[in-house]
Swiss-Prot record:
Gene name in the database record: coq4
Family named by the database record: Belongs to the COQ4 family.
A GO BP entry: ubiquinone biosynthetic process
Catalytic activity of the protein: a 4-hydroxy-3-methoxy-5-(all-trans-polyprenyl)benzoate + H(+) = a 2-methoxy-6-(all-trans-polyprenyl)phenol + CO2
Protein name from the UniProt record: Ubiquinone biosynthesis protein coq4, mitochondrial
Entry keyword set: Lyase, Membrane, Metal-binding, Mitochondrion, Mitochondrion inner membrane, Transit peptide, Ubiquinone biosynthesis, Zinc
Lineage top rank: taxon: Eukaryota
Location of the protein in the cell: Mitochondrion inner membrane
Amino acid sequence: MSILGRRGAAIVARELPLPASSSSILASHPRAFSIFSRPQPKYPGHVPLNAIERGALAVGSAVGALMNPRRADLIAACGEATATPYFIYRLRDAMLSDPTGRQILRDRPRITSTTLPLPYLRSLPENSVGRTYAAWLDREGVSPDTRDEVKYIDDEECAYVMQRYRECHDFYHAVTGLPIFVEGELALKAFEFLNTLIPMTGLSMFAAVRLKPAERERLFSIYLPWAVRSGLGSKELICVYWEKILEKDVNELRRELGIERPPDMREIRRMIREQKKREKERLKQAE
């Protein structure tokens, strides 16, 4: 057959419709997703990512959070991008293996100022979990309504687990008494890493390079040893149903969970400031 003949046959073949059986076969075998394609959302607000996008999000958000540890949105994105494929499933399985954890997964409670009104929490007994939580929120000037919604985790149930961890974070602060400035956050993140194994909490420790030398020395000599003891020795905090123990004595809860309360970071910093002030005054008088 000549070249012209082959071209003519090809044109005719393209113009002829496919048999119905062939069309059905093609329709029943859709093209598989590649690392460059993006799957469909699996729940409201879900932003599915392909492998390349997830890797870029993990690296970009981690670097951005290191440059500015106060960027909660970058920390949240890094947490979601690095939690799969293993770590968030491990946390979900820990909840499934615990009676209280299973109840939380069934009920799916949310922690907001609507579900836990601050006036009610402030009215609870002095040393209760709820009153301690409210006092910590008031002292630090933060709100439970500022947590970002999870959107980069593909499994819908695991997305809730990450959301639950995120919303319980302030309860961890309240029970340990750690403040929200960088030194306090790093101490708590070290504790959370050893308790939850979420990679972002461990990666946060790189932000220690931004601390002042005295703060870094204090973190490594006082608070990291505490984080190791309490993080490894405590129960899975993701399985605590905080909403049901608001009236419980907070010291009793610490004993049950195996959490040792760390030295008061704000008090230590206050004492150091006063000591420096007295030293300056002494030197000034000596002149």
